[in-house]
Design a protein with these regions (language model features):
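Beta-barrel outer-membrane channel/assembly domains of diderm bacteria
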Residues: 2-122, 127, 159, 273-275, ...
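Transmembrane beta-strands of outer-membrane beta-barrel pores
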Residues: 36-42, 75, 89-95, 131-135, ...
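Short strand-coil-strand connectors
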Residues: 116, 162, 229-231
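Outer-membrane beta-barrel and related beta-rich outer-membrane complex signature
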Residues: 44-46, 141, 249-251, 296, ...
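Detector for outer-membrane/organellar transmembrane beta-barrel domains
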Residues: 192-208, 213-334, 340-346, 352, ...
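Extracellular structured ligand-interaction cores
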Residues: 29, 66-68, 84, 108-110, ...
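Surface-exposed coil loops of outer-membrane beta-barrel proteins
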Residues: 35-59, 99-109, 120-213, 382-387
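Residues in well-ordered beta-strands of folded domains
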Residues: 72, 114, 130, 157, ...
């Protein structure tokens, strides 16, 4: 925790010293996120994994402890220009004893400086430099980030252009496979008809040549998003096209990058929140993807998932959830047997939260029972279920943000 203490001290010191730099009383910010889960099945343990949450829904399918603690302060103001320091530490912990030295691992996720109001022509525009979550976009019920280039770099966002907003970022990345690359991201969002908006974004990924590898990894991801609000909720459709040897990196998840996996992928998502009737609501996520890679065995993959979470408000501070998820993937390779993966999940949960009529109300405590089934487990790297088995897990979860 020494790293956390040093970070807190640095931000506090910056805030305290700010009035000496400019005649300005700083505004301090404290925000964060946490979740924790525990449960057991017939064997006395949970099979829950991060990958499983992304595939069939996270309700009743998380057993880790994860947290993010953010601190920030507006440390100086000159006329209408405000200078802000932002920081965030991520903490992961397993179920080890708290007195074990390796129980919690702090990671620095954000540390950057933002300037708002520097441009006389657009006082809402913000310029940033440092390590930052760069306008991440996710689907909450599966914890799936479909647009995430977060890292160390610089950029500008909320820049007015016509009827919409423009942003541009440059981010550097290194991954565990010693692949070094740069991401160039531009996005433009603008309103359409009443309640609707459209965003177009493009990420170009450029690999770096090394003495050992002269081949340059380049890739591109184009993203189109249509958002529609209505009286009973909202809906979003996202279409993505990724191409090139580095197309996985363009999504901000470069951990499986390889220099011999040139190819293309096409993916469509639909997700949103709907009021069915009165106190009965539903959140859903559906997607479908096809990909082909020009590797030594001409790998082709097809992947799909459907997750629905209906929920009903019982009282002012209680509600009941159900969540149903199904996932499938098929991998085809020349001269090899097809690999198939199938997972199905059903969860029922009783939840306590300050405002049970608001899906996003937190903190929330949940008590759940989950049925989980996995078949066709030829894909040996898949965790979260035993091949051809059915498990029932019961447990509790908590989630909060502030």
């Amino acid at each position: 925790m020494k790293k956390v203490n040093l970070l807190l001290a640095a931000v506090v010191a910056a805030s305290v010293s700010a009035p000496a730099l400019a005649d300005y009383t700083p505004n301090a910010y404290f925000n964060g996120y946490m979740r924790a889960g525990v449960g057991f099945d017939k064997n006395g343990k949970t099979n829950n994994t991060f990958q499983g949450c992304r595939k069939v829904g996270r309700l009743g399918y998380e057993d880790d402890m994860y947290g993010e603690i953010g601190l920030g302060a507006d440390i100086a103001k000159v006329d209408d220009t405000v200078w802000t320091v932002n920081s965030m530490v991520q903490i992961d912990s397993d179920n080890a004893n708290s007195w074990a030295g390796n129980d919690a691992t702090p990671i620095l996720r954000q540390f950057n400086v933002e300037v708002k109001g520097l441009l006389d022509s657009d006082k809402d525009a913000k310029i940033w430099v440092g390590k930052k979550y760069v306008q991440r976009e996710d689907i909450h019920i599966t914890d799936y980030y479909y647009y995430d280039i977060s890292g160390t770099g610089f950029g500008i966002y909320d820049l007015s252009l016509g009827s919409g907003k423009f942003q541009a970022s440059y981010v550097q990345h290194d991954n565990d496979n010693a692949e070094n690359f740069s991401l160039f991201d531009v996005r433009y969002s603008f309103p359409l008809w009443d309640g609707a908006s459209f965003q177009i974004g493009n990420v170009y990924s450029q690999g770096k040549k090394t003495k050992e590898e002269q081949d340059q990894l380049n890739g591109n991801m184009l993203t189109l998003e249509l958002s529609q609000g209505f009286s009973g909720g909202w809906n979003k459709t996202v279409v993505q096209w990724k191409t090139g040897a580095n197309n996985a990196c363009a999504e901000g998840t470069p951990y499986n990058t390889s220099r011999d996996r040139d190819g293309n992928s096409y993916k469509i998502y639909n997700f949103g929140e709907t009021t069915i009737s009165g106190d009965l609501h539903m959140f859903h996520h559906a997607d479908f993807e096809v990909a082909d890679f020009d590797d030594s065995v001409n790998t082709k993959t097809t992947e799909w998932r459907v997750v629905v979470r209906p929920w009903y408000k019982l009282t002012k501070m209680t509600r009941i959830y159900t969540e149903f998820g199904a996932y499938g993937m098929t991998i085809k390779k020349d001269h090899k047997q097809d690999q198939n993966e199938r997972i199905q999940k059903a969860t029922i949960a009783y939840a306590i939260t300050p405002d049970a009529g608001n899906f996003w109300s937190r903190p929330e405590i949940r008590f759940y029972a989950t049925w989980l089934h996995g078949t066709d487990g030829n894909v040996t790297w898949t965790n979260g279920y035993r091949k051809g088995s059915t498990d029932i897990t019961v447990g509790a979860q908590v989630e909060a943000w502030w």
